[in-house]
Swiss-Prot record:
Pathways per UniProt: Lipid metabolism; malonyl-CoA biosynthesis; malonyl-CoA from acetyl-CoA: step 1/1
Stretches assigned to the CoA carboxyltransferase N-terminal domain: 25-294
The keyword Transferase is annotated on this UniProt entry: yes
Self-association state and partner proteins as the record states: Acetyl-CoA carboxylase is a heterohexamer composed of biotin carboxyl carrier protein (AccB), biotin carboxylase (AccC) and two subunits each of ACCase subunit alpha (AccA) and ACCase subunit beta (AccD).
Pfam families per UniProt: Carboxyl_trans (PF01039)
Gene Ontology MF terms: acetyl-CoA carboxylase activity; ATP binding; carboxyl- or carbamoyltransferase activity
HAMAP family: AcetylCoA_CT_beta (MF_01395)
Gene3D superfamilies: 2-enoyl-CoA Hydratase, Chain A, domain 1
SUPFAM superfamilies: ClpP/crotonase (SSF52096)
This protein's UniProt keywords: ATP-binding, Cytoplasm, Fatty acid biosynthesis, Fatty acid metabolism, Lipid biosynthesis, Lipid metabolism, Nucleotide-binding, Transferase
The protein's name: Acetyl-coenzyme A carboxylase carboxyl transferase subunit beta
């Protein structure tokens, strides 16, 4: 061995060694194929800069983008029985839960928080499609109910960001039971004369659409979101007909009177604040740089 083998060879070996590169450094737009650096996408609230396509947004980013200065207090959620049916298909349900929790760092599909939206106290729940497709089970149902009761107790509007493939089949009737439970909790919020605002994101389907996702006093949707009960392919196979272009997309639902507005994610916070203030009869916030008009003598 000489200095060449001691110095040159190790350098060549280290140069040729494959470096581990994270898989999510670049994100591809599903519509145009445009590649976007992940930090640029995060800074743009997960909206593709060129096409305007709205990618899925996790609960932490959603809450940060909604509350003033990104500051909020998470609402503690009650524990629920885990896998009471001892369900198993290709894998045990308990194993699927463990994988989802390890992947997302969350206990289940819904996170609830309380904070300020342009100075107005609000309670917000966010459904995470990344956790088993945002499916509605006992834990998610309990989280929505807890959020509604928290809003009623604190006398705040309740904002629900919905994203789900439907009821969680591994929990059977216990999952379906969450549909009437959440509906009853919404009615209690209404009896307290407090606003319930729903933001439908891509996708919102199944039992979630058939319950709390379509019961808002104001129904808002993000652009291009898939919203419906059964998916378009299932409907086409059932009725044996071709569906209209854009069927079940947020723009189609708006044109046919199923939702109140379609709002770009960059305008969502401002829109939610305006709707909450209007429904709570709270004083408006003057535009930045402009002082409120003096009170009449």
């Amino acid at each position: 061995m000489n200095w060449i083998s001691n110095v040159v060879r190790p350098k060549i070996r280290s140069f040729l060694n494959r470096r581990d590169v994270p898989e999510n450094l670049w994100v591809k737009c599903p519509e145009t194929g445009q590649m976007v650096f992940h930090k640029d996408l995060e800074a743009n609230q997960y909206v593709i800069p060129g096409s305007g396509f709205h990618m899925r947004m996790g609960p932490a980013d959603r809450l940060k983008a909604t509350f003033d200065d990104g500051a909020y207090e998470e609402v503690a959620l009650p524990d629920v029985p885990i896998d009471p049916l001892k369900f198993r298909d290709e894998r045990r349900y308990i194993d699927r839960l463990k994988d989802a929790r390890a992947k997302t760092g969350a206990q289940d599909a819904v996170k609830v928080a309380h904070g300020l939206l342009e100075g107005l106290p609000v309670t917000v729940a966010v459904q995470d499609f990344g956790f088993m497709g945002g499916s509605l089970g006992m834990a998610a149902g309990e989280a929505v109910v807890t959020g509604l009761f928290t809003a009623a107790e604190k006398k705040t509007p309740f904002i629900m960001f919905a994203a789900s493939g439907g009821a969680r089949m591994q929990e059977g009737i216990l999952s379906l039971m969450q549909m009437p439970r959440t509906t009853v909790a919404i009615q209690e919020l209404r009896e307290a004369r407090l606003p319930y605002i729903v933001v439908l994101t891509n996708p919102t389907t199944g039992g979630v659409t058939a319950s709390y996702a379509m019961l808002g006093d104001v129904q808002i949707a993000e652009p291009g979101a898939l919203i419906g009960f059964a998916g378009p392919r299932v409907i086409e196979q059932t009725i044996r007909e071709k569906l209209p272009d854009g069927f079940q997309r947020s723009e189609y639902l708006f044109e046919h009177g199923m939702i109140d507005m379609v709002v770009h994610r960059h305008q969502m916070r401002e829109t939610l604040a305006r709707v909450c203030r209007l429904m709570m009869k709270a004083p408006g916030v003057p535009p930045k740089g402009r002082l409120p008009a003096p009170a009449a003598a």
